[in-house]
Each structure stands twice: as structure tokens, then as C-alpha cells.
Amino acid sequence: MMKLTCVLIIAVLFLTACQLTTAETRDEYRAVRSSDEVRNSRSTRDCSGSGYGCKNTPCCDGLTCRGPHQGPICL
């Protein structure tokens, strides 16, 4: 039983590696897309996007910080 489990785990790892190396674009493989989304998440960006607060973080290019002093947002 343990041999079968090991063979299955190795097969799954091999198939996953094949999908990663043969995908033509990153959009084809979900795990790559997910890691990119985490990397580009709001907490790791240097600027605030449209609709996000800009009190402590500057707005991204092309956006302007507007609104009341207590809670301005990027527009």
C-alpha cells in the first residue's frame, strides 16, 4: 500500500511539472497565475490603485488623491 502511495505522489508531481513547463502562457496554469496575484496584491504594491486609500500610500501613475482629509482615495 505504501509503494502505491509513493508512486501516486511521484506521478502527480511529474504531471504538475509537465504542465508548468509546457504551458504556452502563464494564464494556462492556475498555480503560476495565483502566485503572480499574490505578488501583485495591494499589500506589496508601492502605490494605491483606483478606489483605494491614499492617506499613507501615494496613488499609482495617472491617478489623483481626492476626498476628505480623513480618508482620501485615488481617482
From Swiss-Prot:
UniProt xrefs under Pfam families: Conotoxin
Location (main, coarse): secreted
Keyword Membrane: no
Residue numbers covered by the propeptide annotation in the UniProt entry: 24-45
Region annotated Disordered, chain positions: 31-50
GO cellular component, one term: extracellular region
Listed Basic and acidic residues bias regions: 31-45
Stated name of the protein: Conotoxin VnMKLT2-012
Domain remark in the UniProt entry: The presence of a 'disulfide through disulfide knot' structurally defines this protein as a knottin. The cysteine framework is VI/VII (C-C-CC-C-C).
Distribution of this protein across tissues and organs: Expressed by the venom duct.
Key words of the record: Disulfide bond, Knottin, Neurotoxin, Secreted, Signal, Toxin
Organism for this UniProt entry: Conus ventricosus
Upper taxonomic lineage: Eukaryota, Metazoa, Spiralia, Lophotrochozoa, Mollusca
Residues of the signal peptide: 1-23
Superkingdom field: Eukaryota
Family classification: Belongs to the conotoxin O1 superfamily.
Disulphide linkage map: 47-60, 54-65, 59-74
